[in-house]
Amino acid sequence: MKKIGKALRETAFTLGVCFIAVGAFASSSVYAQTIIEDWDKVTRPAPPELKSVTVDIRSTALLVLDFNGAQDPKKGPCNTEIKPRCLTSVPKVQTMLSEARAKGVFIVYSLAGIGTPADIATAIAPHANDPIVKSGPDKFVGTDLEKILADKGIKTVIVTGTSSEGAVLDTATDAALKGMNVVVPVDGMSSTDLYAEQYVAWHLTHAPGVSAKVTLTKIQMIKF
């Protein structure tokens, strides 16, 4: 009987410890917060530093991504109905594009959706020999962009376009992870809203494996 009593007491003690542990876990789970619950507690980070950059024209390509839709909103995202900030960025991109062409920089375009080359904003329209790829947000996926750049000995890409959280972020990230140097002018990328542009600027300068290869800048701070 003594052995049975001792065994019962030990069992009861073990069960008690288990109940306490389960209770503590359940209690902590109730109070555990995810980013969704803590959304309003987030402190906005300081803006990333913009840096001047000089690129080697022989090994640099300018990517002009998804600027189609300017003439017909049904033909792409760069229009007054969906992304008016994209149209606002066109004059600055045009300035950089003109200088890049004059210096012999390799230019590559992309298209989104059902757009055709004729749907790209007229001010920055491609020339006859400019390569044009067409795919989803990451312009390396489902295209020969990597080969196009490799065949030209490209080591640095300047990424412009819309949307910032789509074509710019995904293509810039992929390029960085492939070992390329990536230059992103903040006044050459655009989105539907400011938050997306802010997030992309933060992500590109903080993401592990990416930030070390990315230079965030402005168009006027890029020297060819």
Segments (PLM) and residue ranges:
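C-terminal segment of classical bacterial N-terminal signal peptides
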Residues: 19-29
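Bacterial N-terminal signal peptides that target proteins for export
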Residues: 2-17
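Short, contiguous, helix-prone interaction/anchoring segments in small proteins
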Residues: 58-81
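Short beta-strand segments at enzyme active-site cores
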Residues: 64-65, 105-112
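A short alpha/beta connector and helix-capping loop motif
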Residues: 76-100, 104-106
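Short, glycine-rich nucleotide/cofactor-binding loops
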Residues: 68, 80-89, 160-165
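Active-site-adjacent betaalpha module
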Residues: 31-61, 103, 114-224
